[in-house]
C-alpha cells in the first residue's frame, strides 16, 4: 500500500493556511489537476480533475476527520467511479502545526492508496505520481498563503 508523505513550512499564520486547506472551493487554486469543485456539503464534495488527455474526471470525496487548525482527512469514494478498478482505498491527510515563536506553519500532506488486483504491480509508479502531486500541492499552497 503506497503511503507518500511530503512536508513544508510556510511563513504564514496557521489560520491563513487552515482557511485555504479546509475550504473545498479553494482546491482548484492549489491542488494539482483540479479544475473545479461541485456539490460541496459539510461532509463531502466532488473534484473535477483534468486527465493527461484533457478529459474531465469526477472524483468524490468525503471528509472523514477534521480537527480545526490541526488535521483534515479526505477519503475518496471509489465505488462506481473510474478509480474503482485500480484502487480499493484512497485518502489524503493534511496536518498543520504552528511554530508559535516565528508565527510560521508546518504542513504535512500524506497520500495513502491501496491498489487492487494486478494494479498492485504499479505501486512504484503510483508512489512517484503521488509524490509529484503532493509536492506540487505544497508549492502551490505556499504561493497562496505566503
Positions of PLM-derived features:
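Short, intrinsically disordered, mixed-charge
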Residues: 19-32, 127, 131, 139, ...
Amino acid at each position: 500500500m503506497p503511503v507518500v508523505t511530503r512536508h513544508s513550512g510556510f511563513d504564514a499564520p496557521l489560520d491563513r493556511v487552515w482557511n485555504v486547506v479546509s475550504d473545498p472551493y479553494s482546491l482548484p487554486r492549489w491542488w494539482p489537476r483540479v479544475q473545479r469543485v461541485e456539490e460541496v456539503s459539510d461532509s463531502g464534495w466532488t473534484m473535477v480533475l483534468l486527465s493527461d488527455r484533457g478529459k474531465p474526471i469526477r472524483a468524490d470525496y468525503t471528509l472523514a476527520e477534521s480537527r480545526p487548525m490541526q488535521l483534515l482527512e479526505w477519503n475518496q469514494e471509489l465505488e462506481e467511479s473510474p478509480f474503482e478498478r485500480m484502487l480499493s482505498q484512497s485518502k489524503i491527510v493534511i496536518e498543520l502545526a504552528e511554530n508559535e515563536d516565528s508565527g510560521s506553519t508546518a504542513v504535512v500532506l500524506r497520500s495513502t492508496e491501496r491498489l487492487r488486483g494486478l494494479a498492485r504491480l504499479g505501486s512504484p509508479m503510483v508512489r512517484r505520481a503521488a509524490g509529484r502531486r503532493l509536492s506540487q500541492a505544497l508549492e502551490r499552497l505556499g504561493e497562496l498563503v505566503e
